[in-house]
């Protein structure tokens, strides 16, 4: 189980990312459309003044059950440990062991 503080920190990052996403997108569009270097530099400074945790790359995918940040399958939102346990317990419909 992951630390509660790490899970809460990731929730805060998701909230900030959603809050500043429109503003960040508008600034990036203005940067692409601007012609002068001075204007671009000013817009880059405004973009950099946004909170660091509002960037979408700072968000970590975590397991829904354990909060584990590594080895998380996107299709299920579960870590490999929980995925294996749930698949063996037949809690994931349509998932079968591979055999060839």
Curated annotation (Swiss-Prot):
Q: Which terms are listed as keywords in the entry?
A: Chloroplast, Plastid, Ribonucleoprotein, Ribosomal protein, RNA-binding, rRNA-binding
- SS bond partners: none
- What are the record's GO terms for cellular component? chloroplast; small ribosomal subunit
* Superkingdom field: Eukaryota
- Stored PROSITE patterns: RIBOSOMAL_S14
Location of the protein in the cell: Plastid, Chloroplast
Q: Which GO terms describe its molecular function?
A: rRNA binding; structural constituent of ribosome
Task: Choose any GO biological process term that the UniProt entry carries and state it.
Answer: translation
In UniProt terms, what function does this protein have? Binds 16S rRNA, required for the assembly of 30S particles.
The record ties this protein, via PANTHER family, to: 30S RIBOSOMAL PROTEIN S14, SMALL RIBOSOMAL SUBUNIT PROTEIN US14M
Q: Which family does it belong to?
A: Belongs to the universal ribosomal protein uS14 family.
Its quaternary structure? Part of the 30S ribosomal subunit.
Report the protein name in the record. Small ribosomal subunit protein uS14c
Name the source organism.
Staurastrum punctulatum (Green alga)
Quote the gene name from the UniProt entry.
Answer: rps14
């Amino acid at each position: 189980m992951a630390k509660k503080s790490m899970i809460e920190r990731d929730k805060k990052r998701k909230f900030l990312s959603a809050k500043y996403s429109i503003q960040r997108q508008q600034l990036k569009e203005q940067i692409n459309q601007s012609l002068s270097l001075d204007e671009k530099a000013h817009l880059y400074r405004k973009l950099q003044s946004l909170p660091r945790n509002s960037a979408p790359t700072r968000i970590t995918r975590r397991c829904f059950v354990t909060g584990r940040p590594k080895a998380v399958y996107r299709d299920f939102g579960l870590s490999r440990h929980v995925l294996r346990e749930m698949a063996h317990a037949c809690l994931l419909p349509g998932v079968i062991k591979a055999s060839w």
